[in-house]
């Protein structure tokens, strides 16, 4: 970002002997929305005495996958790299492209209707016994949630890498309670280090209070990671660790046969097999091209791309299949709401009731309201933006049949002191 580069530049000016090593893959820069830009690396490379070194050896992906990635890379118009990547693996691997029609003509109305690729991807999983861990990569959160729900419907062991839309891990009820337990006991000692007795008691109380919560595994994994990294448990270190962490950091997918994720959430991860769902955009941009490049390069052995576009027509592939079937949307879909999809102010009068809820608890739904099934009391309301989205789904023929609590979180309005 501008600030990061300005800091590095200032440090270099103040320390003439300082050596700066900037490492990165410009083709995988998919965080421009955060201010990240490869131009900063290019600017460093232009400075006097600098050297630009391309590291071309790839130890993750099989030969045919790397060939496909190399063929795709020139679609990115602004690139620093020029040399092709070389696979250092013995496996040849497999690249498959399944082409779907962009739309179909309704025989009765004559309207052009979209072709959806959720069903063929699930059929692909069911029909092809891939060895190792498989990941389905989508471009949007909505695509990911619909896909994982369809996998579950077909009895497949799938997990979603959660997307929290900016929700802080620190604000989750289970985390707040754990810290509160430590705070209460630490007041008596006022020591900078959390004693083993206090630590274990706080863990025990939290695990007992939230034993039925679907969110508890995130905190348990967080605690385990903190224990592994810190022999001495400093209170300030714990608070910093919790405050700087995100829910995604503690999403354990090790026991899942199939992982579903957006490309952004899969950055930095790798899988034996990758299946990509790529809907043709109105316009291709470098940002989209880099995102697809990242998705393709997540796999170690096989890459399968389901697409209704032409962008993969010229890359090397072991198998090309044309699937002309007009797949509809699934009969049942799942929407995953974040804190931005509810009217937070509507919860203010029901704090005690909401704190008694646990992740996974069932809620009733009517007219954009969320209520307790036992009493019918309304305790929540969808945001105006989410109400519009729900109306669009209703116009497509979908009706809400059930709702569950995803997370219970702490929240304070901006105007609060």
Region locations from a protein language model:
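Conserved interdomain hinge at the start of the Helicase C-terminal
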Residues: 105-130
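Conserved RecA-like helicase ATPase core segment
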Residues: 2-110
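Amphipathic coiled-coil/heptad-repeat helices and related helical stalk/stem segments
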Residues: 4, 37, 114, 118, ...
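Core RecA-like ATPase module of SF1/SF2 helicases and allied nucleic-acid translocases
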Residues: 63, 133-291, 296-304, 309, ...
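Short, acidic/turn-prone active-site loops that include or flank metal/cofactor-
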Residues: 16, 26, 162-167, 281, ...
């Amino acid at each position: 970002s501008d600030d990061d580069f300005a800091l590095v530049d200032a440090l270099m000016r103040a320390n003439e002997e300082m050596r700066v090593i900037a490492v990165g893959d410009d083709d995988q820069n998919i965080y421009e929305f955060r201010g990240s830009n490869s131009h900063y690396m290019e600017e460093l490379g232009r400075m006097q005495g600098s050297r630009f070194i391309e590291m071309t050896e790839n130890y993750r992906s099989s030969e045919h996958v790397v060939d496909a990635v190399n063929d795709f890379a020139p679609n990115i118009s602004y690139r620093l790299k020029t040399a092709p990547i070389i696979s250092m693996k013995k496996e040849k691997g497999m690249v498959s492209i399944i082409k779907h029609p962009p739309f179909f003509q309704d025989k009765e109305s004559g309207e052009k209707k979209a072709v959806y690729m959720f069903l063929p991807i699930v059929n692909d999983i069911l029909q092809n016994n891939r060895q190792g861990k498989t990941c389905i990569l989508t471009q949007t959160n909505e695509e990911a949630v619909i896909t994982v729900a369809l996998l579950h419907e077909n009895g497949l062991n799938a997990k979603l890498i959660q997307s929290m839309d900016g929700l802080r891990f620190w604000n989750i009820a289970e985390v707040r309670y754990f810290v509160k337990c430590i705070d209460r006991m630490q007041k008596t000692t006022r020591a900078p280090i959390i004693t083993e007795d206090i630590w274990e008691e706080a863990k025990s109380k939290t695990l007992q209070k939230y034993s039925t919560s679907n969110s508890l595994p995130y905190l348990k994994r967080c605690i385990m990671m903190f224990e592994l990294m810190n022999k001495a448990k400093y209170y300030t270190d714990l608070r910093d660790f919790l405050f700087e962490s995100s829910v995604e950091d503690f999403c354990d997918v090790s026991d899942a046969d199939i992982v579903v994720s957006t490309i952004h959430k899969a950055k930095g991860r790798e899988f034996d097999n990758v299946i990509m769902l790529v809907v043709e955009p109105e316009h291709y941009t470098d940002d989209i091209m880099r995102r697809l490049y990242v998705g393709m390069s997540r796999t170690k052995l096989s890459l399968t791309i389901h697409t209704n576009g032409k962008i993969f027509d010229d890359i090397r592939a072991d198998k090309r299949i044309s699937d002309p079937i007009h797949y509809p949307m699934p009969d049942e879909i799942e929407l995953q709401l974040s804190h931005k999809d509810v009217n937070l102010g509507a919860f203010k009068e029901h704090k005690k009731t909401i704190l008694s809820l646990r992740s996974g608890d069932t809620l009733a739904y009517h007219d954009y309201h969320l209520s307790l099934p036992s009493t019918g009391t309304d305790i929540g309301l969808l945001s105006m933006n989410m109400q519009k989205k729900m109306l669009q789904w209703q116009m497509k023929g979908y009706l809400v049949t059930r709702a569950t609590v995803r997370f219970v979180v702490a929240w304070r309005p901006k105007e609060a002191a």
